[in-house]
Amino acid sequence: KIWRS
């Protein structure tokens, strides 16, 4: 992902 995986 992008935010905190």
Swiss-Prot record:
Comment field (misc): Negative results: has no effect on voltage-gated potassium channels. No effect on voltage-gated sodium channels Nav1.3/SCN3A, Nav1.4/SCN4A, Nav1.5/SCN5A and a sodium channel from B.germanica.
Family of this protein: Belongs to the non-disulfide-bridged peptide (NDBP) superfamily.
GO molecular function, one term: toxin activity
Keyword Secreted: yes
Organism listed in the record: Tityus serrulatus (Brazilian scorpion)
Tissue expression: Expressed by the venom gland.
Organism lineage string: Eukaryota, Metazoa, Ecdysozoa, Arthropoda, Chelicerata
Protein name: Venom peptide 8
Function: Has a weak inhibitory effect on voltage-gated sodium channel Nav1.2/SCN2A. Weakly inhibits acetylcholine esterase in vitro. Increases interleukin-6 secretion from macrophages in vitro. Has no antifungal, antiviral or cytotoxic activity.
Compartment(s): Secreted
Coiled-coil parts of chain: none
GO cellular component term, pick one: extracellular region
Sorted UniProt keywords: Ion channel impairing toxin, Neurotoxin, Secreted, Toxin, Voltage-gated sodium channel impairing toxin
